């Protein structure tokens, strides 16, 4: 029990607010030892401080911080708690204690500490940031959004808070309009703070509640009425110039059934205007501001919008008319004609497309010419620079190759331009703090294999993330590889080598790697375990592997949808996919098809083919994965999943803090069958 004065204050508390004359030098000495990595010396000096100045909060703070840096996370909170008792009115002491509790995974205790810190100092952005982080860990999205927003109000250039904020709001949906939220989401899409696909659902929600935009969009049952009103006044211009609407159309396939139908009707309106010689000649800035991005959206989603036979005939006639006009001289071509044709057919498919590049065009047209002519030309030119490392002979491999030559997947536009790079071992320790991870010999400069790199999102992100890494990215499809190489050059990524190869033949290269990643690939092989064994054979001792497999449980609606598609005889062609989508939506009204019709992949033709029409698909169970891991000298490090999912798992299985018990995860998945709809994504390490 503390002895109190008559005024109710503890003498030690007052002492904690006085800085002894000789203390600063000793505190600085502790800090210097920590900065130089002499943590044992720093701990002894900090202990000396607490012995010399037991009533001084800074001494206990230094000890707590040193203990935390040494990894003695359980010993750190008592020292920092002592600092709080000595100086309860200092926000920093509460924040330090919150940091210690957060390291221990005691998020509710950390939340209380950070809440006290911001109450004492409501203008300290870092405390708000940490409060937002623990709210996020606890699944309190609304409270996390409020905290991160406060950080950005106090310090708009706080990079970590920007990323945390958009990652948080990407999981939320709102009922009332917020200008801050709207403009921030528009910036995040335009500048690609995170993958645009992660923001499109939120963007559709925000458009629907924007009082200046939603009247233009109509409703699910009356989209046509809103379309007819589009040409009144400057409505087209207002929509086209709206930063969020514009950024979404130009960045990512639209993931919203109502908005997709509205855009489909808007495309028909564009066709009707362009087919009319009088309307086509009136290609004013307002029309181009709206219809130009709409045509870009059509290219991005691979022309997935449904189209009647009559409409396609009219579009084909307009395309033929455009080709004739170009042959007679590009100066006679109406900009709106180009935009309308580009909304139905890729411009590179026109035999006379080079002539279009010879003329100066308004921005709305020039952007389309870059997207649909110049960039595909660059990809064709890059094909000859991509080496072939192995033959492709397996029948299934050849069928999969053919699919991705026809439909490179995904057709992404933007990725975050820069990611803070980290050493691979540090990254894994941050991902899986409760797991014992063996030392990776070449962690400082790892050799990385991306087996099945697709159109480049995966290798580009890995090349940026893993510090001083050298990446080999292979795929079956030359169309995908040339897209990936163009995008990597566009982003200035220089540590990736792209090559064509079959995973089944990679063992013939006699190469080994510190990190191997193959996400969403092995389940498309004739036998996934065969390919998996090839990759394990190429992994160095203590090397790590990131994999992604479809879940048998989570894909149940996809399996049912594939049965329905086969029953109706829809072909894996552009027309077949366009016909199947409304049919599946109709079935979903009476027989839920779950994520099969709600996945973002449903809203792009190439992605929908990958989702529902793939030529080869296996699905695994956690029992199969566990058996392979045990039989092939691997150890399970953990799943990459949302904090809320991990929190729910810990609530269900508190005795597994590392979250590595796959039998527990199998129970969890049975109870929560959509947990792994995307995929099982996890990390492994190869044992000696």
Q: Where are these predicted regions, by residue range?
A:
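Conserved class I S-adenosyl-L-methionine
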Residues: 544-594
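Alpha-helical solenoid repeat scaffolds of the TPR/TPR-like class and their adjacent stem/linker regions
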Residues: 1-445, 460-463, 540
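Conserved SAM-binding loop of SAM-dependent methyltransferases across substrates and taxa
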Residues: 455-468
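A short glycine-rich, Lys/Arg-flanked "PGG" loop and its adjoining helix->strand segment in the class I
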Residues: 529-541
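A short SAM/SAH-binding and catalytic strip from SAM-dependent methyltransferases
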Residues: 514-527, 551
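Conserved SAM-binding strand-loop segment of SAM-dependent methyltransferases
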Residues: 492-504
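Rossmann-like AdoMet/SAM-dependent catalytic core
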Residues: 187, 191, 210, 577-688
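A short acidic, Gly/Pro-enriched loop at the edge of an enzyme's catalytic core
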Residues: 506-516
């Amino acid at each position: 029990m503390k002895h109190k004065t008559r005024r109710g204050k503890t003498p030690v508390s007052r002492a904690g607010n006085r800085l002894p004359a000789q203390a600063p030098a000793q505190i600085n000495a502790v800090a210097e030892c920590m900065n130089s990595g002499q943590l044992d010396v720093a701990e002894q000096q900090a202990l000396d401080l607490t012995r010399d100045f037991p009533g001084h909060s800074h001494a206990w703070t230094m000890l707590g911080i040193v203990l935390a840096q040494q990894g003695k996370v359980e010993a750190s909170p008592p020292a920092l708690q002592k600092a709080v008792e000595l100086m309860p009115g200092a926000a920093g002491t509460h924040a330090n204690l919150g940091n210690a509790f957060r390291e221990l995974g005691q998020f509710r205790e950390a939340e209380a500490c950070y809440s006290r810190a911001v109450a004492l100092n409501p203008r300290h952005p870092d405390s708000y940031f940490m409060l937002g982080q623990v709210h996020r860990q606890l699944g309190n999205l609304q409270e996390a959004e409020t905290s991160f927003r406060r950080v950005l109000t106090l310090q708009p250039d706080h990079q970590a808070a920007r990323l945390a904020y958009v990652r948080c709001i990407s999981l939320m949906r709102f009922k009332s309009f917020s200008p801050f939220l709207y403009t921030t989401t528009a910036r995040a899409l335009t500048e690609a703070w995170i993958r645009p696909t992660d923001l499109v659902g939120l963007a559709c929600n925000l458009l629907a509640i924007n009082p200046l935009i939603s009247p233009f969009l109509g409703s699910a049952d009356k989209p046509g009425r809103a379309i007819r009103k589009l040409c009144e006044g400057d409505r087209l211009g207002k929509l086209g110039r709206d930063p969020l609407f514009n950024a979404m159309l130009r960045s990512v396939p639209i993931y919203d059934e109502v908005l997709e139908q509205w855009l489909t009707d808007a495309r028909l309106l564009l066709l009707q205007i362009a087919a009319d010689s009088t309307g086509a000649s009136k290609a004013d800035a307002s029309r181009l501001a709206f219809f130009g991005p709409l045509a870009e959206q059509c290219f991005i989603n691979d022309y997935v919008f449904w189209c009647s036979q009559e409409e396609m005939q009219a579009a084909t006639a307009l395309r033929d008319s455009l080709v004739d006009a170009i042959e007679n001289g590009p100066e006679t071509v109406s900009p709106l004609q180009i935009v309308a044709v580009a909304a139905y057919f890729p411009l590179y498919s026109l035999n006379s497309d080079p002539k279009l590049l010879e003329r100066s065009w308004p921005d709305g047209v020039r952007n389309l010419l870059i997207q649909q002519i110049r960039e595909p030309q660059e990809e064709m030119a890059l094909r000859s620079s991509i080496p072939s490392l192995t033959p492709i002979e397996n029948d299934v491999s050849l069928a999969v190759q053919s699919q991705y030559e026809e439909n490179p997947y995904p057709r992404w536009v933007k990725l975050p331009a820069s990611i803070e790079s980290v050493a691979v071992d540090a990254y894994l320790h941050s991902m899986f703090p409760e797991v014992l991870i063996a030392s990776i010999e070449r962690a400082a400069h790892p050799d990385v294999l991306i087996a099945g790199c697709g159109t480049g999102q995966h290798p580009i992100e890995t090349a940026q993330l893993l510090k001083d890494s050298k990446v080999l990215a292979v795929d079956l499809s030359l169309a995908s590889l040339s897209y990936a190489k163009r995008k990597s050059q566009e982003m200035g990524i220089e540590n990736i080598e792209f090559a064509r190869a079959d995973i089944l033949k990679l063992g013939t290269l006699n190469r080994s790697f510190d990190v191997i990643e193959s996400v969403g690939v092995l389940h498309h092989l004739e036998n996934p375990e065969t390919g998996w064994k090839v990759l394990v054979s190429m992994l160095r001792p203590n090397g790590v592997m990131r994999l992604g497999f479809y879940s048998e449980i989570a894909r149940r609606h996809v399996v049912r949808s594939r049965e329905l598609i086969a029953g109706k005889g829809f072909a894996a062609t552009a027309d077949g996919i366009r016909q199947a989508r409304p049919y599946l939506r109709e079935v979903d009204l009476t027989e839920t098809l779950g994520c099969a019709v709600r996945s973002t992949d449903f809203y792009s033709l190439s992605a929908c083919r990958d989702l529902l029409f793939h030529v080869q698909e296996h699905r695994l169970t956690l029992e199969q994965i566990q058996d392979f891991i045990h039989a092939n000298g691997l150890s399970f490090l953990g799943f990459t999943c949302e904090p809320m999912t991990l929190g729910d798992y810990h609530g269900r299985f508190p005795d597994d803090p590392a979250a590595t018990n796959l039998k527990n995860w199998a129970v969890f998945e049975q109870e929560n069958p959509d947990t792994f709809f995307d995929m099982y994504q996890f990390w492994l390490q190869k044992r000696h």
